[in-house]
């Protein structure tokens, strides 16, 4: 009898939960339609995996890529619609959030073809890899639109858990296991600090969790200038700092970049920064509206440390992946300038524009590393010497992406940095911009050093890795070259094409 009553209660509770979920999807599903497409793609992947054999592997890539492209299409159709807050205040849809969601989807779309040959050569489990990539993308998209403290905490955890699993995907690799352990421990610690800061905001605002309501709550409780706000600001900065990986929160970055599978590093190097930048912009600009001087100072310190340490330490690296890890630390310093400037002087527009170019430059470089690594088994910088004599296309692609990362004209990276630094200069950030210009010159040096090695033709400098290098016989069928070509073209577009990009980026007020 007791069992019968408990069973009935369980069925009733399950029915209520299902009906509530159905009600939310029915009345709010249109507001998260791009995310719903990814969810259906995930379900379809699981269904096909449970009923198929190895012959259906190409379908997994097709379903994943199609889901991402359809999500991008859904975002385009929703562009310029009125801002909407849905799911009882948990999620906000506006142009600002959508452009960051587009950047995340673009990263994932380019990373999947970049991973195909790597997965086949290393015999990694394809379904789990694609599931983790799509789920991480989903977490990043929800983080971009997060409008309350709970979603701001849960969404990055969804992304982080998939990131930990992806970084440790090659279980037999000792370096991968070590990198995953460091990543997991530091990620857990940073999440604890982040939720500590969020709890301070919750308490000081009188129990509010929505971002705009927190501002109203702080005004009502008169706590917007209290010491507790400073504690919340520092804690949240540390928590978000781990995701952005500026100095001094960068300790995990070089080890994870070096130890993780290269396609995973390519994915994490851009998506985590895009999602964290969107979240940081909203958190600092809305709940900490009354503490703008304090968070500006904090971010200025992080930007200076990142630009100096990232570029100086990159000079001494012998591994391509570690060099790009420290380079990314310097790059995030430039992005922080846009966050500090804010919307008054097109700071957000310059940040979005530079981030779009950074995606193409960075993924293009990683595509070259994946291609070279699969054919030689190394990512040591010295082993790239003389690559131009064996594979001119790969060498030129690497050179163009590296030059664009360095900011040499007339490549896209130059115009991105020029616009970013110009906005910073107009906002009065003279010292920050000066540091940015000097460190950009330093970065050009170590990028040119690699390019010199790529183009050398002296036999005594060419290593056995390049001497025994074999080009892909069917380049048109190689998916890595597809991603590489797209990224190289996007990294080298002339300045005349900047106007439409800037026009879209400037229309991102939230």
From Swiss-Prot:
Source organism superkingdom: Eukaryota
InterPro entries in alphabetical order: NADH-Q_OxRdtase_suN/2, ND/Mrp_TM, Ndh2_N
One Pfam family cited in the UniProt record for this chain: Ndh2_N
Known role: NDH shuttles electrons from NAD(P)H:plastoquinone, via FMN and iron-sulfur (Fe-S) centers, to quinones in the photosynthetic chain and possibly in a chloroplast respiratory chain. The immediate electron acceptor for the enzyme in this species is believed to be plastoquinone. Couples the redox reaction to proton translocation, and thus conserves the redox energy in a proton gradient.
Origin species: Coelogyne cristata (Orchid)
Encoding gene, per UniProt annotation: ndhB
Primary location: plastid
Catalytic activity, EC: 7.1.1.-
One GO cellular component term noted in the UniProt record for this chain: chloroplast thylakoid membrane
Keyword Hydrolase: no
GO biological process, one term: photosynthesis, light reaction
Subunit (UniProt): NDH is composed of at least 16 different subunits, 5 of which are encoded in the nucleus.
Family classification: Belongs to the complex I subunit 2 family.
Enzyme category, top tier: translocase
Taxonomic lineage: Eukaryota, Viridiplantae, Streptophyta, Embryophyta, Tracheophyta
Catalysis performed (reactions): a plastoquinone + NADH + (n+1) H(+)(in) = a plastoquinol + NAD(+) + n H(+)(out); a plastoquinone + NADPH + (n+1) H(+)(in) = a plastoquinol + NADP(+) + n H(+)(out)
Tagged with keyword Membrane: yes
Cellular localisation: Plastid, Chloroplast thylakoid membrane
Transmembrane parts of this sequence: 24-44, 59-79, 99-119, 124-144, 149-169, 184-204, 229-249, 295-315, 323-343, 354-374, 395-415, 418-438
Name the record gives this protein: NAD(P)H-quinone oxidoreductase subunit 2, chloroplastic
GO molecular function, one term: quinone binding
Membrane-topology annotation of the record: Multi-pass membrane protein
Keyword line: Chloroplast, Membrane, NAD, NADP, Plastid, Plastoquinone, Quinone, Thylakoid, Translocase, Transmembrane, Transmembrane helix, Transport
């Amino acid at each position: 009898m007791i069992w019968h009553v408990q069973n009935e209660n369980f069925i009733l509770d399950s029915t209520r939960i299902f009906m509530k979920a159905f009600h939310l999807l029915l009345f709010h599903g249109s507001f998260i339609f791009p995310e719903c497409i990814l969810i259906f793609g995930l379900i379809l992947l699981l269904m096909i995996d449970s009923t198929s054999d190895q012959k259906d592997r190409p379908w997994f890539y097709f379903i994943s890529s199609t889901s991402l492209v359809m999500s991008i299409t859904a975002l385009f159709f929703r562009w310029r619609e009125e801002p909407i807050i849905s799911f009882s205040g948990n999620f906000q849809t506006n142009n600002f959030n959508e452009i960051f969601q587009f950047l995340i989807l673009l990263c994932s779309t380019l990373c999947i073809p970049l991973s195909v040959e790597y997965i086949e050569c290393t015999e990694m489990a394809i379904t789990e890899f694609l599931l983790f990539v799509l789920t991480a993308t989903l977490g990043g998209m929800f983080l971009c639109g997060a409008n309350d403290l709970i979603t701001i905490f849960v969404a990055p955890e969804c992304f982080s858990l998939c990131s930990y699993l992806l970084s440790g995907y090659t279980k037999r690799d000792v370096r991968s296991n070590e990198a995953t352990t460091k990543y997991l421990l530091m990620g857990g610690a940073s999440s604890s600090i982040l939720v500590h800061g969020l709890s301070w905001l919750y308490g000081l605002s009188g129990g509010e969790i929505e971002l705009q309501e927190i501002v109203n709550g702080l005004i009502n409780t008169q706590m917007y200038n209290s010491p507790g706000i400073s504690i919340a600001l520092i804690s949240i900065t540390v928590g978000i700092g781990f995701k952005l990986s500026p100095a001094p929160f960068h300790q995990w970055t070089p080890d994870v970049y070096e130890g993780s599978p290269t396609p995973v590093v390519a994915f994490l190097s851009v998506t985590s920064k895009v999602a964290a930048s969107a979240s940081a912009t909203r958190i600092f600009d809305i709940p900490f509206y009354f503490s703008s001087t304090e968070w500006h100072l904090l971010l200025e310190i992080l930007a200076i440390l990142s630009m100096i340490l990232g570029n100086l330490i990159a000079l001494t690296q012998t591994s391509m992946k570690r060099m790009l890890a420290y380079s990314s630390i310097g790059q995030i310093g430039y992005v922080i300038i846009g966050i500090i400037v804010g919307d008054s002087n097109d700071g957000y527009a310059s940040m979005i524009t530079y981030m779009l170019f950074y995606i193409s430059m960075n993924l293009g470089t990683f595509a070259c590393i994946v291609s070279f690594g699969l054919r030689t088994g190394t990512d040591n910088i010295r082993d790239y010497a003389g690559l131009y004599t064996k594979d001119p296309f790969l060498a030129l692609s690497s050179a163009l992406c590296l030059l664009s990362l360095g900011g040499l004209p007339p490549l896209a990276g130059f115009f991105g940095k020029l616009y970013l630094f110009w906005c910073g200069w107009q906002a009065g950030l003279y010292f920050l911009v000066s540091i940015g210009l000097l460190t950009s010159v330093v970065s050009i040096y170590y990028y040119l050093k690699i390019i010199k090695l790529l183009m050398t033709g002296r036999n005594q400098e060419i290593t056995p890795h390049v001497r025994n290098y074999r080009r892909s016989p069917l380049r048109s069928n190689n998916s890595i070259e597809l991603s590489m070509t797209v990224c190289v073209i996007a990294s080298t577009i002339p300045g005349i094409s900047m106007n439409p990009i800037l026009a879209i980026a400037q229309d991102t007020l939230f």
